[in-house]
């Protein structure tokens, strides 16, 4: 299951996951302080400082997600890079903090194909290449996911994931490394 993560809801999330019996759980940050990290949230009235503060808060929540150890997998770690108003605001410091938290806790980041195909406006994956390299520098391995919300999304996204893995030489962890 993929589940939203908010630091204030960690106790409720833990209770839910303990009783739900899922084989594994993907945690993702979709909202920060009541605002969407998705491209349909407007930041038009926000200046650079407010946008940077939102990005900082987003990555604080991502680090909190990893440190909570509630989830096996960290989903689309750099979701905010999809947002035109936030794209390019992820810093090396953000990437290092997230990678260090994943390395320390064993939370496995997902190479996610949700930015590709009909739903995505890019031919890119999550995380972006600088994030992939930072994870690799920290010895963090990956799982892969299509983020398919419709069966028709699988084929093209699987092809894109295969090309990416072949190009980068990344050997993802098998599902058995996540389950159980």
What are these regions (language model features)?
Residues 1-105, 166:
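Extended substrate/RNA-proximal surfaces in nucleic-acid metabolism proteins
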